[in-house]
């Protein structure tokens, strides 16, 4: 099982969640929302071979935490994975969008200078702005657009730029989410939960529930579930080879 976008440190009891991950053999990318949270999450995860921790600066927090971008850049040499980063154009965060763009551009430039990173990218309400930034920094790494909700034209542009995509059970509950997922390139897709924000009724999804969307995704792609599982694992294994990192 693969959960390539999970806020592990934001669960009420992350240790219990980690024990569940260990028990089930789930592969997890634990994204963070601030650089200051990265070291704590790394310590929490320890040496678990199936869990990676991404260095993040969430766009919703940029207005308050933009000064942490220097710390972010200072930590970049220690990780292959970056996220959650990006731009949020939803109404509550439009007031900081110019600052968000500036911070995102600086992060991408730092990633490019460091040889590229695997990037878990937020683009809600700002897909065009995110793609503009990625196009300006083509060597920043491998962008994986998490829970992409842009237009079909923006999806086509993202595809042409070589972007990857992570999709999950909540995304595939909506008609638009299913329509977008149906046209995403299967060899550049992974599964996610966005837990604990992604929910199953009144409860947060758990990382091992990322595959709750497999039947729906297999149907959208015209594949058998076993074939889809193999493709997702092949994608995950290929990903680290696409960036330079000697840490």
Task: Name these PLM-found stretches.
Residues 1-247:
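Mid-domain alpha/beta scaffold segments of enzyme catalytic cores
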């Amino acid at each position: 099982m693969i959960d390539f976008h999970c806020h592990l440190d934001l669960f009420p009891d992350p240790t219990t969640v980690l024990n569940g991950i260990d028990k089930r053999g789930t592969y997890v990318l634990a994204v963070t929302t601030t650089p200051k949270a990265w070291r704590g999450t790394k310590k929490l995860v320890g040496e678990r071979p199936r869990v990676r921790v991404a260095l993040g600066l969430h766009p919703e927090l940029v207005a308050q935490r933009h000064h942490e971008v220097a710390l972010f850049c200072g930590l970049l040499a220690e990780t292959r994975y970056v996220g959650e980063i990006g731009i949020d154009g939803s109404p509550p965060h439009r007031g900081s969008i110019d600052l968000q763009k500036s911070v995102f551009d600086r992060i991408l430039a730092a990633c490019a200078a460091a040889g590229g990173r695997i990037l878990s990218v937020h683009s809600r309400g700002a897909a065009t702005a995110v793609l503009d930034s990625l196009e300006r920094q083509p060597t920043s790494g491998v962008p994986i657009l998490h829970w992409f909700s842009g237009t079909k034209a923006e999806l086509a542009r993202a595809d042409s730029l070589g972007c990857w995509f992570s999709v999950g059970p909540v995304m595939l509950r909506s008609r638009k989410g299913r329509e977008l997922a149906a046209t995403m390139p299967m060899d550049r897709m992974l599964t996610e939960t966005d837990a604990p924000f992604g929910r199953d009724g009144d409860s947060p999804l758990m990382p091992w529930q990322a595959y709750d969307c497999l039947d729906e995704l297999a149907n959208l792609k015209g594949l058998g579930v076993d074939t889809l599982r193999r493709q997702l694992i092949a994608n995950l294994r290929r990903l680290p080879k696409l960036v330079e990192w000697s840490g």
